[in-house]
Regions:
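Short surface loop/edge beta-strand patches of beta-sandwich-type extracellular domains
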Residues: 102
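Transmembrane alpha-helices and immediately adjacent membrane-cytoplasm interface residues
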Residues: 68-98
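Soluble "head" domains of membrane/secretory-pathway proteins
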Residues: 2-50, 57-72, 98, 106-296
Length: 296
């Protein structure tokens, strides 16, 4: 479901009703309210002259009834300001997402609700996703949300491990960027609550940014070369891992749950035009509210 498109359509439809409400329907109701009030005052001039409170209240209710929006305008024009604010916030500032899988463990858990910054990587037109203003670019270590290159109706979340021009290598479960080993330290046990499997949690220093990764010793370090990657002349695979050089305007992204993540190793690079934004914090997890906070 393309929620951005649905929200855009709702904004346009309610906006049209709001314009007609302001320019046509509201002036009509005001005119009718004035006519009804004039007729009522003419018929009850004596009582109003005496200051009859009951008649005065009837006049007030008459005006309020004549000015009241019909239900179909309440649910269209009346909702437009709220829908417009949501649309603008979601399109240009922040968008919420829910983590559906364990591919980013131990950093992000299933059920985490995260907030994604929509402007760090440039201002884009809603729905079209066309960049109209350059702001910045993903850096190594950023957790990004992007449209899955194999099915752009689906959003993925992974960590950027290499940027355009970088040579990235994953060998024997260790990451190398431009020939430099991204050091791993402090191994300890980590239990994946969704599968009840014990993984090894390590701290990886990715170009100066320390973050947690999970290693599954039940799985090999190599991954089968998918058909899409066979077309990439800058990548090679062997029984110990792979080596890739990242093309311009593309990024290499991997899940922190290194052996249980379908990522750039399988389906290729993330194009710049597929970027949605940068994950900045966890704002809710209804199973564990203690997880609320920054993810860096």
């Amino acid at each position: 479901m393309n929620f951005a498109l649905i929200l855009f359509i709702l904004t346009v439809i309610t906006g049209i009703f709001w314009i007609f409400e302001r320019t046509v329907f509201l002036p009509q109701r005001r005119r009718k309210a004035e006519e009804a009030a004039s007729a009522f005052e003419a018929a009850n001039r004596e009582a109003l002259g005496r200051g009859d409170a009951a008649v005065g209240e009837d006049l007030r209710r008459l005006k309020a009834t004549a000015l009241r929006q019909p239900w179909w305008l309440e649910y269209t024009a009346g909702l437009f300001p709220v829908i417009l604010i949501v649309f603008l916030l979601r399109s240009f500032l922040f968008e919420p997402f829910r983590i559906p899988s364990g591919s980013m463990l131990p950093t992000l858990h299933i059920g985490d609700f995260i907030l994604v910054n929509k402007y760090d990587y440039g201002i884009r037109l809603p729905v079209l996703n066309t960049k109209v203003l350059e702001m910045g670019a993903p850096q190594k270590g950023d957790i990004i949300v992007f449209r899955y290159p194999m099915d752009e109706s689906v959003d993925f979340i992974k960590r950027v491990v290499a940027t355009p021009g970088d040579r990235v290598e994953y060998r024997d479960k260790v990451l190398y960027v431009n020939g430099v080993e991204q050091a791993q330290s402090r191994p300890r046990d980590f239990v994946d609550d969704s599968t009840m499997v014990t993984l090894e949690e390590r701290t990886e220093n990715l170009s100066g940014l320390e973050h947690s990764i999970a290693v599954d010793h039940r799985r090999p370090s190599w991954v089968p070369m998918q058909a899409v990657m066979k077309k990439e002349s800058t990548c090679s695979y062997n029984d110990r891992g792979f080596v890739c050089t990242v093309p311009e305007c593309k990024y290499f992204a991997m899940g922190d749950n290194r052996d249980n993540s379908e990522d750039s190793r399988f389906w290729g690079f993330v194009p710049d035009e597929n970027l949605v934004g940068k994950a900045v914090c966890i704002w809710a997890n209804f199973s564990d509210m203690g997880r609320i906070g920054s993810i860096y």
